[in-house]
Structure formats: C-alpha cells, structure tokens
C-alpha cells in the first residue's frame, strides 16, 4: 500500500492523517499528526497476523469518537466485526481511501 494522506476534523482540531503499512507484517496503519506536524495519535492496532486486503483494526477503547470521525470523513467503515485485543475489543473496518 502506498502512502495516502488526508485531513480529519476531530475534537476541535484539524489533523493530518497518513494511511500506510506497519513495517513488520504489512497491515495498514492510520497515524494522525497535529497542525505542527507532531504525532497526535495512532488510530489502528497492528495484530500479530496479516489482515485480508483492505481491512484495518481501529482501536476505540479510549476514543470511540475517533472511529466516528474516521467514518464521517469517508476514511473507513465498520464491518460489524470486533476483535479482542488485550482486555478490550477493537473494530474491524474497511479502508475506503
């Protein structure tokens, strides 16, 4: 997957987003940066196995509103499946960009 950039409005901030792949297994990662270019948050979780093409795991244990913002912006959509991650569950989503 090549680098894809986007902007995301979340919690009153305009963030620059990058969709790329984790280096080890190649699963997609969404990293968000603030207006100064500093890392803001990572929206995804890397699992120890490869995901099917076009899918990403979005963590919501701390920030469910982040998933809503990503959906509203047309970046991802929920598949309806969740994946246990530690003591929480994360949402399996389709990448739309």
Language model features by range: what are they?
Residues 2-42, 50-53:
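Catalytic phosphate/metal-binding cores of nucleic-acid and nucleotide-processing enzymes, i.e., regions
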Residues 32-75:
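Acidic, aromatic-enriched beta-alpha/helix-loop junctions
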Residues 59-97:
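Short, compact, well-ordered microdomains
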